[in-house]
């Protein structure tokens, strides 16, 4: 070919980027970077035409795992394709998938809560699980309380004694009214109580000198054992009475014997 031949006009779009990276006439031209989804270069995609990508083969052609893949559909238009939206994997709950594999799918809150899901409308899933867990704990406590308070089967009920007594009046025995009376102690009981309650007194603790000074001796009180003649005793008593009477009237004084005497000096008999 002749060197003076006119060169082909550069192509625009993705084809221009591919031809610029080849070892053709435009090898000196810098590759035009193409922006992919989320600001990533299209050179990291599957259609990269860089010398490094051509040298290493198909290893660099596949997109890395940590970068979202961009799909470029070949088209005849020169306009760049719109940036594809990032595909979100996983559940709608927002859980991120693990690198090793897809996580086990969790049951929706409606399956966990069951029939009570209607009362949790408008509540987040985490709050719904917490409320359901609290309801389970409350029901478990109530079940434990019911088992403790429940009666044991097989035990006979003992009827009340009051009802049996009211039904059968023949078993009731009439009793006298109970009247509480205070018992009065007698003298003997009081003396016994005083004997045991009072402290013991000894004669040695009492001074009897004042009492013995006034009293007579036992010798003065003693009398001779002489038989009494009732006639003589009565005569002496009558003469003493007459003497006191005459003395009061101013008559003769009675004698020592206490009797009255006549003119001859003989005692006069007293007539009773």
Swiss-Prot record:
Ranges for region Disordered: 1-138, 244-272
Keywords for this entry? Cilium biogenesis/degradation
Record field: transmembrane: none
Question: Which Pfam families does the record cross-reference, listed alphabetically?
Answer: IFT43 (PF15305)
* One Gene Ontology CC term in the entry: intraciliary transport particle A
Q: Which domain of life, per UniProt?
A: Eukaryota
Q: Is Glycoprotein among the key words of this record?
A: no
Q: Which residue positions does the secretion signal occupy?
A: none
Is the NADP keyword given for this protein?
no
Q: Where is the composition biased (Basic and acidic residues)?
A: 126-138
GO terms for biological process?
A: cell projection organization
- The parts of the chain that form a coiled coil are none
Extent of Gly residues compositional bias? 36-51
Q: How does it assemble?
A: Component of the IFT complex A (IFT-A) complex.
Q: What does this protein do?
A: As a component of IFT complex A (IFT-A), a complex required for retrograde ciliary transport and entry into cilia of G protein-coupled receptors (GPCRs), it is involved in ciliogenesis. Involved in retrograde ciliary transport along microtubules from the ciliary tip to the base.
Instruction: Return the PANTHER family for the record.
Output: INTRAFLAGELLAR TRANSPORT PROTEIN 43 HOMOLOG
Record's protein name = Intraflagellar transport protein 43
Native source organism of the sequence: Chlamydomonas reinhardtii
